[in-house]
Regions:
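Surface-exposed, interaction-prone regions used to assemble/regulate multi-protein complexes
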Residues: 1-98
Length: 98
């Protein structure tokens, strides 16, 4: 699986504050006020824990793998590659769309 450099640059070192799975939408809020929404088909792992620091994001077509500094991971299948992830900063400005 290749590292998604653009998404990794946007969220690397951000710390998870809250993790919610609402139907097919995964919401991750970070302690700095930024947030990520991912439209998923399924989630294949336990949720990220509060306080987890994002190390990198890898992707292979419909698979997205979040890797954290504490070695925890989140493996999800996205619905529409290139159109399933949005990351916004604390001012609600889009930093990543894909």
């Amino acid at each position: 699986m290749a590292v998604n450099l653009k998404l990794t640059r946007a969220i690397k070192d951000r710390i998870v504050q809250n993790f919610q799975l609402n139907g097919s939408v995964l919401l991750i809020n970070f302690v700095d006020g930024s947030m990520m929404a991912v439209t998923i088909a399924k989630c294949n792992s336990p949720p990220l824990q509060e306080g987890a620091r994002i190390r990198q994001i890898s992707e292979d077509q419909t698979k997205l793998l979040f890797e954290c500094e504490d070695h925890s991971t989140l493996d999800v299948t996205i619905v529409d590659p290139g159109n399933s992830v949005i990351f916004r900063d604390k001012n609600n400005q889009v930093e990543y769309l894909g």
